[in-house]
From Swiss-Prot:
Span of domain CheB-type methylesterase: 1-189
Enzyme Commission identifier(s): 3.1.1.61, 3.5.1.44
GO cellular component: cytoplasm
Biological role: May be involved in chemotaxis.
Keyword Cytoplasm: yes
Gene: cheB2
InterPro entries hit by this protein: CheB_C, Sig_transdc_resp-reg_Me-estase
Family named by the database record: Belongs to the CheB family.
PROSITE patterns attached to this UniProt entry: CHEB
Chief location of this protein within or outside the cell: cytoplasm
Catalytic activity: [protein]-L-glutamate 5-O-methyl ester + H2O = L-glutamyl-[protein] + methanol + H(+); L-glutaminyl-[protein] + H2O = L-glutamyl-[protein] + NH4(+)
Extent of the signal sequence: none
Record-given protein name: Putative protein-glutamate methylesterase/protein-glutamine glutaminase
Length: 193
């Protein structure tokens, strides 16, 4: 399978989780990654700037109408839902909170699954609510790959547990093993080109 995007949902404990996964990805990592991290509406974005210093690949805040490109990590801006359009660009919404959250993981996952279908990898990491569980279910329904952090290794296990209860998942892994899986799937993409 040639995967075209990875979407990651993370909440409480997310900075530490991202510090474990993203810095291990090599410079030539090709699959674009889009992250919704539950953050406060007034966040200044420092959380991903910390990561940027540790990583080999470029991390940036997603922009309205921006085209999703390989080799990039995009993060949702505070206080906006991040959606993926059919032309593989971002759009923002200030619609109602979903699962008490804006940005919402479910909103990203559901729109991404409609665009990428079976070429999408959905990932749920540590967090303190059930956001992302229904979105991951939608990814599975559209033939995508579902990956969940092992709740036993999560800083807060509620979000991974909710995802596991909502749908059948392909992988339940530690953060280190998730990073290894990403690298392996990206290598498979290169070999299939």
């Amino acid at each position: 399978m040639n995967y075209e995007a990875i979407v990651i949902g993370v909440s409480a404990g997310g900075i530490n989780a991202m510090k474990t996964i993203l810095p291990t990805l090599p410079t030539q990592f090709g699959i674009p990654i889009v992250i919704v991290q539950h953050i406060g509406a007034r966040s200044d974005g420092e959380w991903f700037r910390i990561l940027e210093k540790l990583c080999n690949i470029k991390i940036k805040e997603a922009e309205e109408k921006e085209e999703i490109k390989s080799g990039m990590v995009y993060v949702a801006p505070p206080n906006y839902h991040l959606l993926i359009e059919k032309d593989k660009t971002f759009s923002f919404s200030i619609g109602e909170r979903v699962n008490f959250s804006r940005p919402s993981i479910d909103v990203l996952f559901e729109t991404a699954s409609e665009v990428y279908e079976d070429k999408l990898i959905g990932v749920i990491l540590t967090g303190a609510n059930s956001d992302g569980a229904q979105g991951l279910k939608k990814i599975k329904e559209n033939g995508g790959l579902a990956v969940v952090q092992d709740p036993l290794t999560a800083e807060i296990a509620l979000m991974p547990r909710s995802a596991i209860e909502a749908t059948s998942v392909d992988y339940v892994l530690s953060l280190e093993k998730i990073a290894e899986l990403f690298i392996r799937l990206d290598q498979n993409n290169l070999e299939q080109r």
